[in-house]
């Protein structure tokens, strides 16, 4: 792949072998790179295939995010996809990365947000909640910030919303009644 545009030191816009527009992420992948130069495959950590309508938003979000938040998000989404055994929406990367970034900022600023639905989330979406709890460990390892348990519930709901398998709506409908 060749560089189309350097977004920052860790993010490049390019095209894959199918001609699809992609964002390529990796530590230092964009450092001193210019359009037309080849991307070092050894530095590629993640490739995001872009839909036309999401390109600008993803570029803006990822260019302003610390690399640790992006890496934590990648690891969480990979773990969740395997654990849930289903495909998750690409928008999960955007939404979850943004959420994690602001949760870390709130935590550092001493601004807690209580998850009023935490008990219900544990009950109706226990698997997603357990993934959320593991996500807190991933975030701690990648960023050095331990987020409160309430955030595991918020992450669980991001996973539920990103699920591509909408066959079992009963738990969601039950939660909505509450």
Question: How would you label these PLM feature ranges?
Answer:
Residues 1-178:
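A cross-family "folded-core" feature that marks the main globular domain of proteins
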